[in-house]
Amino acid sequence: MKTNLLDFTLPALTEHFAAMGEKPFRAKQVMRWMHQMGQNDFDAMTDLAKSLRAKLHDTATVTVPSLMLEQASSDGTRKWLLDVGTGNRVETVFIPEDDRGTLCVSSQVGCALECTFCSTGRQGFNRNLSTAEIIGQLWWANKSMGVTPKNERVISNVVMMGMGEPLANYDNVVAAMRIMLDDHGYGLSRRRVTLSTSGLVPAMDRLREDCPVALAVSLHAPNDRIRDEIVPINKKYPLRELLAACERYLEKAPRDFVTFEYVMLDQINDRPEHARELVALVRDVPCKFNLIPFNPFPNSGYGRASNNAVRAFRDILAEAGYITTVRKTRGEDIDAACGQLAGQVQDKTQRKVRWLDKGGSTEAGV
């Protein structure tokens, strides 16, 4: 079987080329061709020796997921549906803003964590994505938008906030982020790569040492009682442990704060008393808040908090001194908004079957 070079960080690719009898600078050349010029044809890598190109043809490939569908929203958001084989598809989303362009990248086919308000979670779980399948999303987005080294950068930020829990696919996600950060890869700064986690505490501690990027935490609740219900991983790593891990992470993080994400669910976690409880909860953690209006999907069982409830919640946090934003709902007309990504998952957990047995809908998130 041929080796997919997209799976390699620069050190790993350098080692691979050394085993082929090639000098280290060849690895840098190939990295730039793959990631900066979006090239997956060895014959087009014209500054490589013909003998090396022949070796690569025989032993290697640059294989990205197959593009199945590209959609553009009326607000400029773009979504790509990528086939990763055996009936599984994942989604990645580009969100343009005045001062930046953010790509939301998936890390798994489905998700095993079963957050109750998330469409991806309802689809069940199949497998982790490979490093090539993760970085291939960035590769495709650049390719689709016509990005070249001579163009102005379009994707300025990457957020690991798509399908899946990134820290549950630790090795492949870290390798992909290292490629994003590498000057011979995508050249992003650590401040511009954000990993979002539901709170896998041991992996957060590993990430602090291995590849500290900006951190976002899917908090969504002001106490363990509510969080146990809507983010079940909280039963294993309760809020006290999660917040302590956030404090430890900030010792080496590129930013001096954690972003807490908080989906606003009507009558569940959106009351003024919840906001005040939240202020008390995070008092020892330098942080910002990102309030996320819930994006309904069929038979989700939840409603979106009212605009008045969101404003009142935001004001309580702001008055306590916390920078608080309310996320704009982007790409809703193409199901690209937060919590709507579902792709196509050949579920190994039977979660979808169990959900249907309870009277759910096969339309959830699709």
From Swiss-Prot:
Active-site residues, as the UniProt record annotates them: E91, C338
One Pfam family this sequence matches: RlmN_N
Catalysis performed (reactions): adenosine(2503) in 23S rRNA + 2 reduced [2Fe-2S]-[ferredoxin] + 2 S-adenosyl-L-methionine = 2-methyladenosine(2503) in 23S rRNA + 5'-deoxyadenosine + L-methionine + 2 oxidized [2Fe-2S]-[ferredoxin] + S-adenosyl-L-homocysteine; adenosine(37) in tRNA + 2 reduced [2Fe-2S]-[ferredoxin] + 2 S-adenosyl-L-methionine = 2-methyladenosine(37) in tRNA + 5'-deoxyadenosine + L-methionine + 2 oxidized [2Fe-2S]-[ferredoxin] + S-adenosyl-L-homocysteine
InterPro entries for this protein: Aldolase_TIM, Methyltransferase_A, RlmN_N, RNA_MTrfase_RlmN, rRNA_lsu_MTrfase_RlmN/Cfr, rSAM
GO molecular function: 4 iron, 4 sulfur cluster binding; metal ion binding; rRNA (adenine(2503)-C2-)-methyltransferase activity; rRNA binding; tRNA (adenine(37)-C2)-methyltransferase activity; tRNA binding
Protein name: Dual-specificity RNA methyltransferase RlmN
EC number: 2.1.1.192
Disulfide linkage: C104-C338
UniProt keyword annotations, A-Z: 4Fe-4S, Cytoplasm, Disulfide bond, Iron, Iron-sulfur, Metal-binding, Methyltransferase, rRNA processing, S-adenosyl-L-methionine, Transferase, tRNA processing
Primary location: cytoplasm
Sequence similarity: Belongs to the radical SAM superfamily. RlmN family.
An annotated GO cellular component: cytoplasm
Cofactors (names): [4Fe-4S] cluster
Cofactor remark from the record: Binds 1 [4Fe-4S] cluster. The cluster is coordinated with 3 cysteines and an exchangeable S-adenosyl-L-methionine.
Broad enzyme group: transferase
Other comments on record: Reaction proceeds by a ping-pong mechanism involving intermediate methylation of a conserved cysteine residue.
UniProt key word Transmembrane: no
Compartment annotation: Cytoplasm
One GO term of the biological process aspect: rRNA base methylation
UniProt-annotated binding residues for [4Fe-4S] cluster: C111, C115, C118
Ranges where the Radical SAM core domain occurs: 97-333
